[in-house]
Amino acid sequence: MSNPLYNKNIISITDLSRAELELIVSTANELKQHPRPDLLKNKVIASCFFEASTRTRLSFETAVQRLGGSVIGFPDSGNTSLGKKGETLADSVQVISSYSDAFFMRHNQEGAARLASEFSSVPVINGGDGSNQHPTQTLLDLFSIYETQGTLDKLQVAFVGDLKYGRTVHSLTQALSLFDCEFHFVAPPALSMPEYIIDELKEKGCTFTQYDSLDGVLSKLDILYMTRVQKERFDETEYQHMKSSFILTAQMFEGVKDNLKVLHPLPRVDEITTDVDSTPYAYYFQQAKNGVYARQALLALVLTNEFGDK
């Protein structure tokens, strides 16, 4: 089989082609339908979280174990040599990678995963670096979109909330730009999509519109991607002002498309009310579950040649 992802670092979604994204999605679907509990037997995966995480870490470690691999690492760097003794990231990566077959990491500094890949002896998978990239979240988002829409092409997609600091929306916008989707960006001016993303869309000839409210947007959509205003990136006064700017309620779904699905990278705060959970449009909990299959697919492709083009 031809597998272009074998032994490859996964640092940014922009490092992946349309064909590679489609391969990951199809592999996730295959593993969801047909589990492979021994695929990573005797493989050791380092799971190193220099920044706190719940869903990403647990999802990734579940993915490893359900493929038969084992996990080493830490959920918080505060008690490691890097946190306690001032060891450099480069030194930590060189040592930890020597114990493992792949290195999965999250870090609060932009570019940390790229730096780690320069010193690692095994493939590095980025679990999020600051407000920059979160490629494995994007892969589970793509899988969830494909699962609900039957395609990734020519969809109407809205991103709502914190579009400035939300690394999930940056990565997913870049990925979907390869599939001729039309974008609707809904955010307060202080949290609008970064100019570099806007410039990339213009260069690719993608269609997009920017809004400061949800009014008139919902009826157009196939996918509504909600995000929280991230408290850790604001002082308390700014956060209280921003957090409730855009709230989705069940009453707002009148006149929407039957195939509309609401996604959210979680955790949610105020931006989706709980009455949305019981509507046919809510898909964020299934989306979170899909993180296991998307990360299984990535591990399967990076560490084995069992999948790919025949």
UniProtKB/Swiss-Prot annotation:
Coiled-coil parts of chain: none
Functional pathway: Pyrimidine metabolism; UMP biosynthesis via de novo pathway; (S)-dihydroorotate from bicarbonate: step 2/3
GO molecular function: amino acid binding; aspartate carbamoyltransferase activity
The enzyme's E.C. designation: 2.1.3.2
Top class in the EC scheme: transferase
Top-level taxon of the source organism: Bacteria
SUPFAM superfamilies for the chain: Aspartate/ornithine carbamoyltransferase
This protein's GO CC annotations: cytosol
GO BP, sorted A to Z: 'de novo' pyrimidine nucleobase biosynthetic process; 'de novo' UMP biosynthetic process; amino acid metabolic process
Record has Manganese as a keyword: no
InterPro entries assigned: Asp/Orn_carbamoyltranf_P-bd, Asp/Orn_carbamoylTrfase, Asp/Orn_carbamoylTrfase_sf, Asp_carbamoyltransf, Asp_carbamoyltransf_Asp/Orn-bd
Gene3D superfamilies: Aspartate/ornithine carbamoyltransferase
Family: Belongs to the aspartate/ornithine carbamoyltransferase superfamily. ATCase family.
Stored NCBIfam families: asp_carb_tr, PRK00856.1
Oligomer and partners: Heterododecamer (2C3:3R2) of six catalytic PyrB chains organized as two trimers (C3), and six regulatory PyrI chains organized as three dimers (R2).
Function: Catalyzes the condensation of carbamoyl phosphate and aspartate to form carbamoyl aspartate and inorganic phosphate, the committed step in the de novo pyrimidine nucleotide biosynthesis pathway.
Name used for this protein in its record: Aspartate carbamoyltransferase catalytic subunit 1
Species classification: Bacteria, Pseudomonadati, Pseudomonadota, Gammaproteobacteria, Alteromonadales
